[in-house]
């Protein structure tokens, strides 16, 4: 059974307009300063074999490349690499219009769940996400519900990031300090 996308579709998802289509892999560019490395390992080889058999089943998340032509990969760097190794020339993508800070948060969030992340990858990812969160606003409501007239306590970006990733604020700060020691 072949699940490849031949046409494209446009739809609304929450606050975003998204387009799904197939594109040439050479029109996709890696996310600027992407902190996660695509390593050739057993998992990537298994993904490559799956793509050879079924194609890319989950579209890559991209945005229009703000630095030139083509599209910038937000999520799916491993799928893109495995597709190249599998001999694919096109992959399905979801194009989402994202500002820089939104793109950073989406890129980091889509990769932090992976097993075997290196401390250096976490360090740069936490730093990038924290910087993006700070650009969006320094103090955030602790509750994400609609204002119901109740008084909400406020938390800063460090505390919110720590809660989101299951680390302490001190541990987040230790990871981020690593970025001063590690060359990019």
Question: What do the predicted segments below correspond to?
Answer:
Residues 36-38, 44-45, 81-179:
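Amphipathic, charge-rich alpha-helical segments that serve as recognition/docking helices
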Residues 183-184:
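Short Lys/Arg-enriched helix C-cap and helix-to-coil transition segments
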Residues 2-96, 102-116:
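Short, charged/polar connector segments at secondary-structure boundaries
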